[in-house]
Amino acid sequence: MLETKRLILRPFLESDASDLFEYLEKPAVNCFASMKINSLEEAKSESLKRAKNTEFYFAIVLKETGKVIGEIDAYPDRTEPGESDTPPDTFSPCWMLNEDYQKKGYAFEAAYAFFDYLFSKKGARRIYAYTEDYNFSSQHLCEKLGMRREGLFMEFVSFVKNPDGTPLYENTMQYAILKKEWDAQKAINK
């Protein structure tokens, strides 16, 4: 469990289903389209799935009310093929917030604590994130976290279909930060 001034980042519980349903009933960006939930029963099942991953998957919870307003997770990425015994040192995070709680600094607060957790407790050497070229909020968040833009992948991935059924390919930006950059940034901001 991680704690910030206004938030608690903790593993999901089955009782988080209604809050999960609230923000996954209509995902805000295409990359979350496959996570769409159609019923409270489906949300309960998804809450239980998320609850099984307690190391890298957290509910973002308002301290004041206990309401789940989003989630943040990371996918460990092995840098060398065949090193299954070696702990990963590269992570790709993903964050999603209920639209009613966006633009209030919660995403930054959660991501900052989560990045610090990955760097200080999980041995991260590098963290990288993908965001669509139209998702200016996520781009701004990456930059605020001290991540540098590393590239733009044209027509990189398709999450949804065009009206004619063909894939709608989206342009994707990659941002990243190294542990030494994170540590230097933290030292300056002390």
Stretch-by-stretch model annotation:
Residues 13-15, 47-50:
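Short linear motifs in intrinsically disordered
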Residues 28-49:
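Conserved GNAT-fold acetyl-CoA-binding loop/helix
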Residues 48-59, 70:
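A short helix-loop-beta-strand connector motif used in the catalytic cores of GNAT acetyltransferases and
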Residues 1-27, 31, 61-190:
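Acyl-donor (CoA/ACP) binding surface of acyl/acetyltransferases
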Residues 43-44, 53-56, 161-163, 173:
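Short, intrinsically disordered/low-complexity patches at protein termini
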